[in-house]
């Protein structure tokens, strides 16, 4: 479909960017992702198109619904945020995040979460401007750090 092709193309562009790791999506990911996304009800995506350029895909947000045990409610993790270089600075990400928040509220989510690289100052500035903050419970314990372990 047009939307899935846009999603794969935008995600591949993001993966190739230094903020996305600097490597293209694997052939496996490109061919398997459409079916994998369709089978997971806890995932949703928001796409942005520039209709003045013939419905050119210019933005993508992929989200994963999780669960807050403390609140006993769903939460939505904003997993990928992509805006093509030619369209940055036009508040496309902000508009997509407004829609993500509406969808999350519709799902009964208690909060949105996301990770941002410390060197991605433009993204961090946007996120703070629209209400995101570093995660912490007790200020004396500091804020959370995002960690990973490859399997």
How does the language model describe each region?
Residues 79, 84, 117:
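Residue-level recognition of the GNAT/N-acetyltransferase active site
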Residues 1-73, 79, 97-99, 103, ...:
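Acetyl-CoA-dependent GNAT
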Residues 74, 90, 106-110:
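Short coil/turn segments at alpha/beta junctions that flank glycine-rich nucleotide-binding fingerprints
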Residues 83, 89-102, 125-129:
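Conserved acetyl-CoA-binding loop-helix of GNAT-fold acetyltransferases
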Residues 66-68, 86, 119-121:
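Short coil/turn motifs at secondary-structure junctions
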Residues 108-151:
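C-terminal "cap" of GNAT-fold acetyltransferases
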Residues 1-3, 84, 120:
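Acidic/polar helix N-cap motif
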